[in-house]
Amino acid sequence: MKLYIATPINARQEPTMREKLVAAKRRVEMLKAIIADDVRFKDYELLSTFDFNDLYETEEKAMSRCIYHVLTSDAIYLDHGWTASKGCNLEYLTAQIYGKLIFYK
């Protein structure tokens, strides 16, 4: 089973896109460590945009890959601040429409 971790990137407070990406990647790494210790997620493979997208991808290309991975995952985990992120909202709506399990931080 797969669990897709959605965390805001563009909605972050850091001033440059590079800093936003670095901060979001650190956040995902921290979340993966926390989630891995949660018994609810013991059978899940954990993945996020940083597992399959290049840091220099266009936003459109990166989001298309993210949506693909939401569709092929069994569940989605929405991090703090997801409602302020267009990308996370798109991932949430995709998960909702396709009946995926949805977990919230």
Regions found by a protein language model. Give the residues of each.
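Conserved catalytic or regulatory cores that recognize and/or transform ribose-phosphate-containing ligands
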Residues: 1-105
